[in-house]
Amino acid sequence: YLKEVVTLSAEQETLLQGIIDRLLQGEPLQYIEGKAPFCGMSFIVNPSVLIPRPETAELVDWIISDNTTQQPHILDLGTGSGCISISLSKQMPQATVEACDISEGALEVAKANNRENCTSVTFFHHDILDLTTPLPHSYDILVSNPPYIMQSEATDMELHVTEWEPHTALFVPDNDALRFYRAIAEIGQTEVLKPGGHIYVEINQALGKETAELFESYGYKEVTLRKDIFGNDRMIKCYK
């Protein structure tokens, strides 16, 4: 069946052409629209933050399924858009959730998402790699989706990712690819992670074994490596 032909106004034509031009330049549709879906919610996104991925939603689901009756105090390290922390706060109203990031631009986006989704996450500025600056509380759960893509892997990635999404949230040097996981493991060894507390992280699929061994080397127990929906090593859980 033929649908009714719609005639666009000059203003609408200009707007549509602008969108087409941005798409042709490789800009992600989520940045053009200014929003992206995640865990049944809508999140504001712009080039200050990564676009949420379905694999990360699996990490959120893992935490929720493990903590249905507890009232955990959670810290999201490197929150970006706030998609992890806000989703946990929304689906675990009994939890106290905090989140940090080194990027002020990312924190602005995360705080806006906190308001839009009517959650009560506390956000603050912090550099995960700065082990000298204390964190504000002790937590039951540390969660993170830190930068983990090696610089050498960039050539195999789509241009809409490498040209538009923030490199500081994506890439790590090949010669120190696990730097953020090492920092998280060291943070967890302090009073920041309570005895018996858990760490959940998203990881590089090419470094699953190495990342698991890193947490084991720090004395964490029951280090569990889990695959994502695509069959790739993607998440690790362990406890103190």
Region annotations inferred by a language model:
Residues 1-65:
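Conserved AdoMet
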Residues 30, 149-152, 206:
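Active-site beta-alpha loop architecture of Rossmann-like, nucleotide-cofactor-dependent enzymes
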Residues 33, 125-126, 227:
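Short loop/edge segments at beta-strand edges and connector loops
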Residues 42, 96, 120-122, 221-224:
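Conserved beta-strand segments of alpha/beta enzyme cores
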Residues 55-156, 183:
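Conserved SAM/SAH cofactor-binding pocket of Class I
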Residues 148, 239-240:
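C-terminal beta-strand of the catalytic ATP-binding
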Residues 148-180:
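Mobile active-site "lid"/loop adjacent to the S-adenosyl-L-methionine
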Residues 174-238:
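Conserved Class I SAM-dependent methyltransferase catalytic core
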